[in-house]
């Protein structure tokens, strides 16, 4: 293929930096967030008020990290920097001031790619979307079908305040869902007189009933109101006026306990049209009165008052890394404050220094807990560059302070009109998290308040103004404008052509003339997320399939020789660049040196810039990270140019799969139900071969009987098996290993008790044996094989941090090449996925008129019912492009260039391809897009013409090698005594109720009995059966399954007298075989078979 790519449809868009969300947020934390927190805790005074400790937040500094990123990964360390802050201790009595720089903890730093390295693993902090603080007005139906209204004031942290009305038109208030209190009681407790309240309201007559109700209860002074408030909020405690005052103040007016946050203050001011200054973050009397006023206007149905939609993106905000980390730092500082106060009280006031007071542990623990075990700190998905990029742009509604899967209803998960251009309507997981985990749209950004904004071009008198920068609008602002979609047709100077334009206005669609349009979307792609925007002809796919297509691109395994798509969307290079997988030069200059490990660029001033390349590193998902240079020595490069390809990249563009020749036709039933028939060429030419790197680890521990030893001298092992081990007993790099081979030899000291009787006898006869050790080596697991890539040895002497009790840790990395095989999962970009059912020799595959055999045969029945016709467009466009020897970029949503544009373009390209020399067979106008294929086995043509073309097909990470599994004898569950489940536990196959029904229906009684007893949890039966098989005797009758006994015991423990009886009414003792069996192991071994119980009579 030539590297020229034709851009069909010009997009006037360049994408923003796609990882900006993460980077900007962390930068804000370092510059502002951390200082804000340190300042808010300063000063800390002791209980007597003698000592004051000030944190001087602006003067905090970070030390250089101890390890750089690569070193941290290799040593399993955290890439972090030490934080120091200047503290000032003031003794009020003597006036003495001590100033000192104090260590307050380690802060993990973000790498350039927007990730964190915690204990050697790359992690991502996912953005969280939560309800914005502010005031919300809702309506509810009471049980008589009458509408009541309520208002909630939700702070960033602190108590919720909820105002509600009842059927008698009385106003009530609840604090944090406690019992309701007459609203006027709260007003009086806050020190407001009746007139203060009445003057502020536009319709005081509604409120007067609440005043009367308060008077009727005998609460007519501030003191009585405070007592009443205290009774309601703290029932059971003796009320007092001072207690009431303190309670009210701490609940709503103390900045440490109640904080609306910058956003909350902004939202309240905006909703209630107030002018309270930005830095007042607690409730004011004005807030409460305006809320009551607004609520009364709602009740009386007076214009200007509107209800809030809590799913509107104007009422939900994004908390990114910076803010989540700031909240965590606050938790740590809260604990620290308590410790400091205690130490101030206990210590000698004169000799105290700031360093003695400040203990870094609570802050370190809080930060560590956040990065290590928070729901939002996730192990990065590194399957391919797209997976990595999408993970950083993910927005989750779960996590601390968010929703839970079980509680989230349908409304929260649903697509909302305000998502347009902000959250992708397509990319979300299938299953219980659907709609709770979203992806940021391509052009969206998060503003300073945490609301998502999206860009537009302004329209003046029907002309789109594309000069200068686009205007970013948040969901609130956009609601008030008439916004046209990005694919409206315009002339050269930007005048809108149509007479009526469909626009969105206040979450509805209407048609207006061009001069009424306020804004036009930047690009048709801005509605969808990055992964979705890589699907060509997306507009022809059903949404459910586009969702699968988006999600499956993230699961594509990087191939040995990746190939970028013939039909792309034009965003491929940006995705590769922003994922951080490809090295980019930051200067203009000349490439002065290139080899496999580094690229050196000399800039204009003669300075050398070295770029080290990643070679065969293991990713989090065991795929292979490797970079290959694409520049040559002496090449001119400009700033921002890609120097090398990463995994799943080619020519600086993302390349997740291969372009293969596909035919849509049934073939001997091998592609029934989404199965895929592939040609042997895929295996022999390594089209879908990928490299996987497994990590195996063993530690030599200190045991009670002495240390374990890593050695070559392993008992009862032939010299042949030790061929590839070095003198230490560790495998040499480059060795090929099969399953069961020793990677690291290790022996463990063995105690007296570990010896079987025959060995004791031998030792008694022949005296002391040389050493008493047991083989405990690290071996290659079943079903695995490969080549040793790297061996790393960690010891305390080298200064490595080891787990407690370990003397040495050895890690072996084994690489395997996995060719495609039957059982692997493959997929296209349109949600068309399937499993390989057969690999045919290429001579048997159907072939084209020029003799080319096809690579893949798919079932045409997979298209109509699933409505993902985009795959057919891609197929034919790819066919034309391959014959024209070019690559094509098609932007989704192309109707702005005319109706049925996709169709016309593909037809035009096919016609163009057939005009080439000797290629007239490529396009048949009678049957466009179809060719008459011949059967490779007989050479006869098939009955019907078949759709053939090139499509981009991916191999997904669900490989059969990782799933195939068999068990003979293995571990059992302790309680039920049934075999465990799953490959990792060496488990058995589950026989569920449906399988039992099938065997019952078939009448296979003995097979069924065997499956439910001796092959599962009849303990005595399975031991006897094994014994019988070993000795060649008939298998005895099965006994009672253990799980049945457990059920009986459980029912008996409820006090039910339940037993099993024979026909004659004689009770069967289920527990008769329990006692003798206690001595034998639960897992039959050949040693236990030799014991006297099972001896022949």
Curated annotation (Swiss-Prot):
It comes from the Bacteria. Its EC number is 2.7.7.6. The keyword Aminoacyl-tRNA synthetase does not apply. Residues 1070-1097 are annotated as: Disordered. InterPro entries: DNA-dir_RNA_pol_bsu_ext_1_sf, DNA-dir_RNA_pol_bsu_external_1, DNA-dir_RNA_pol_su2, DNA-dir_RNAP_su2_dom, DNA-dir_RNAP_su2_hyb_sf, RNA_pol_bsu_bac, RNA_pol_bsu_CS, RNA_pol_bsu_protrusion. The lineage of its organism: Bacteria, Bacillati, Cyanobacteriota, Cyanophyceae, Synechococcales. It catalyses: RNA(n) + a ribonucleoside 5'-triphosphate = RNA(n+1) + diphosphate. Keywords: DNA-directed RNA polymerase, Nucleotidyltransferase, Transcription, Transferase. Gene3D superfamilies: 2.40.50.100, 2.40.50.150, 3.90.1100.10, DNA-directed RNA polymerase, beta subunit, external 1 domain, DNA-directed RNA polymerase, subunit 2, domain 6, RNA polymerase alpha subunit dimerisation domain, RNA polymerase Rpb2, domain 2. Belongs to the RNA polymerase beta chain family. Coiled coil: none annotated. DNA-dependent RNA polymerase catalyzes the transcription of DNA into RNA using the four ribonucleoside triphosphates as substrates. GO terms for molecular function: DNA binding; DNA-directed RNA polymerase activity; ribonucleoside binding. This is DNA-directed RNA polymerase subunit beta. Residues 1077-1091 have a biased composition (Polar residues). In cyanobacteria the RNAP catalytic core is composed of 2 alpha, 1 beta, 1 beta', 1 gamma and 1 omega subunit. When a sigma factor is associated with the core the holoenzyme is formed, which can initiate transcription. One of its GO terms (biological process) is DNA-templated transcription. GO terms for cellular component: DNA-directed RNA polymerase complex.
């Amino acid at each position: 293929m030539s590297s020229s790519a034709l851009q069909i449809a010009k997009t006037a868009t360049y994408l923003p930096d796609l990882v900006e969300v993460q980077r900007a947020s962390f930068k804000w934390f370092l510059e502002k967030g951390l200082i804000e927190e340190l300042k808010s805790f300063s000063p800390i005074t002791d209980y007597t008020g003698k000592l004051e400790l000030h944190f001087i937040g602006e003067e905090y500094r970070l030390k250089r990290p101890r390890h750089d990123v690569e070193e941290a990964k290799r040593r399993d360390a955290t890439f972090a920097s030490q934080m120091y802050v200047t503290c000032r201790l003031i003794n009020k009595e003597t006036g003495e001031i001590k100033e000192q720089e104090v260590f307050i903890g380690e802060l993990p730093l973000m790498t350039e790619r927007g990730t964190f390295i915690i204990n050697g693993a790359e992690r991502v902090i996912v953005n969280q979307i939560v309800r914005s603080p502010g005031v919300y007005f809702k309506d509810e139906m009471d049980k008589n079908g009458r509408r009541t209204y309520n208002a909630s004031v939700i702070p960033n942290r602190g108590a919720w305040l909820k105002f509600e009305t009842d059927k008698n038109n009385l106003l009530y208030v609840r604090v944090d869902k406690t019992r309701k209190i007459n609203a006027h009681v709260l007003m009086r407790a806050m020190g407001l007189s009746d007139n203060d309240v009445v003057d502020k309201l536009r319709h005081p007559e509604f409120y007067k009933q609440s005043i009367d109700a308060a008077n009727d209860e005998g609460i007519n002074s501030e003191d009585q109101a405070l007592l009443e408030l205290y009774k309601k909020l703290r029932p059971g405690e003796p009320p007092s006026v001072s207690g009431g005052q303190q309670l009210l103040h701490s609940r709503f007016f103390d900045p440490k306990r109640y904080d609306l946050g910058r956003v909350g203050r902004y939202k309240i001011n905006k909703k209630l049209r107030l002018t309270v200054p930005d830095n007042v973050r607690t409730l004011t009397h004005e807030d409460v009165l305006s809320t009551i006023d607004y609520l009364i206007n709602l009740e009386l149905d007076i214009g200007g008052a509107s209800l809030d939609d809590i799913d509107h993106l104007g009422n939900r905000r994004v908390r990114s890394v910076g803010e989540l980390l700031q909240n965590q730092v606050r938790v740590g500082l809260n604990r620290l404050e308590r410790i400091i106060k205690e130490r101030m009280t206990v210590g000698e006031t004169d000799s105290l220094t700031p360093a003695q007071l400040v203990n870094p542990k609570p802050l370190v623990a809080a930060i560590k807990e956040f990065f290590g075990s928070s729901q939002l700190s996730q192990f990065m998905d590194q399957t391919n560059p797209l997976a990595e990029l999408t993970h950083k742009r993910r927005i989750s509604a779960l996590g601390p302070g968010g929703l839970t899967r079980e509680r989230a209803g349908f409304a929260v998960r649903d697509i909302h009109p305000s998502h347009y251009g902000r959250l992708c309507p397509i990319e979300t997981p299938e299953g219980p998290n659907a709609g709770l985990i979203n992806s940021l749209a391509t052009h969206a950004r998060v503003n300073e308040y945490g609301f998502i904004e999206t860009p537009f071009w302004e329209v003046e008198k029907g002309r789109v103004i594309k000069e200068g920068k686009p205007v970013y609008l948040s969901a609130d602002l956009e609601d008030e404008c008439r916004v046209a979609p990005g694919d409206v047709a315009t002339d050269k100077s930007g005048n809108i052509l149509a007479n009526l334009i469909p626009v969105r206005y206040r979450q509805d669609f209407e048609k207006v003339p061009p001069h009424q349009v306020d804004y036009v979307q930047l690009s048709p792609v801005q509605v969808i997320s990055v992964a979705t925007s890589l699907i060509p002809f997306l507009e022809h796919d059903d949404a459910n399939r586009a969702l699968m297509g988006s999600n499956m691109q993230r699961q594509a395994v990087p191939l040995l020789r990746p190939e970028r798509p013939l039909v792309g969307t034009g965003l491929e290079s940006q995705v590769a660049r922003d994922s951080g997988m490809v090295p980019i030069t930051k200067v203009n200059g000349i490439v002065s040196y290139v080899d496999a490990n580094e690229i050196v660029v000399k800039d204009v001033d003669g300075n050398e810039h070295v770029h080290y390349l990643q070679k065969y590193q293991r990713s989090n998902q065991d795929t292979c990270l490797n970079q290959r240079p694409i520049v040559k020595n002496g090449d001119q490069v400009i700033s921002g140019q890609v120097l090398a390809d990463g995994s799943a990249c080619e020519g600086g563009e993302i390349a997740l799969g291969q372009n293969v020749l596909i035919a849509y036709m049934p073939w001997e039933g091998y592609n029934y139900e989404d199965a895929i028939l592939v040609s042997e060429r895929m295996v022999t030419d390594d089209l879908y071969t990928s490299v996987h790197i497994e990590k195996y680890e063993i530690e030599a521990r200190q045991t009670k009987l002495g240390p374990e030893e890593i050695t070559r001298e392993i008992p009862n092992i032939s010299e042949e098996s030790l061929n590839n081990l070095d003198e230490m007993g560790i495998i040499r790099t480059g060795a090929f290993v099969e399953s069961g081979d020793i990677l690291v030899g290790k022996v463990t000291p063995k105690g007296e008790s570990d010896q079987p009787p025959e060995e004791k006898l031998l030792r008694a006869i022949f005296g002391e044996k040389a050493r008493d050790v047991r083989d405990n080596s690290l071996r290659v697991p079943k079903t695995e094989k490969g080549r040793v890539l790297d061996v790393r040895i960690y010891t305390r002497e080298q200064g490595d941090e080891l787990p407690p009790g370990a003397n040495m840790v050895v890690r072996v990395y084994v690489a395997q090449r996995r060719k495609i095989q039957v059982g692997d999962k493959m997929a296209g970009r349109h949600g068309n996925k399937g499993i390989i059912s057969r690999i045919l020799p290429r001579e048997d595959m159907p072939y084209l008129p020029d003799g080319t055999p096809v690579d893949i045969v798919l079932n045409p029945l997979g298209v109509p019912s699933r409505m993902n016709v985009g795959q057919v467009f891609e197929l034919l466009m790819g066919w034309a492009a391959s014959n024209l020897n070019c690559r094509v970029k098609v932007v989704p949503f192309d109707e702005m260039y005319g109706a049925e544009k996709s169709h016309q373009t593909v037809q035009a390209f096919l016609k163009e391809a057939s005009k080439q020399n000797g290629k007239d067979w490529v396009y048949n106008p009678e049957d466009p897009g179809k060719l008459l294929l011949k059967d490779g086995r007989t050479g006869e043509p098939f009955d019907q013409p078949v759709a053939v073309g090139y499509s981009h097909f991916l191999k997904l990470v669900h490989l059969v090698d990782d799933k195939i599994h068999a068990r003979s004898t293995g571990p059992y569950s302790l309680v039920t005594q049934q075999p465990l489940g799953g490959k990792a536990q060496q488990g058995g196959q589950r026989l569920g109720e449906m399988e039992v029904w099938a065997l019952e229906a078939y009448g296979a009684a003995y097979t069924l009995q065997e499956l439910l007893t001796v092959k599962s949890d009849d303990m005595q039966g399975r031991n006897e059966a094994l014994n019988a098989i070993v000795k060649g005797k008939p298998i005895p009758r099965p006994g009672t399954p253990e799980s049945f006994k457990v059920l009986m015991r459980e029912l008996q423990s409820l006090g039910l007298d339940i037993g099993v009886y024979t026909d004659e009414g004689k009770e069967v003792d289920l527990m008769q075989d329990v006692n003798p069996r206690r001595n034998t192991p639960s897992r039959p071994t050949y040693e236990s078979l030799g014991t006297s119980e099972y001896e022949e009579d």
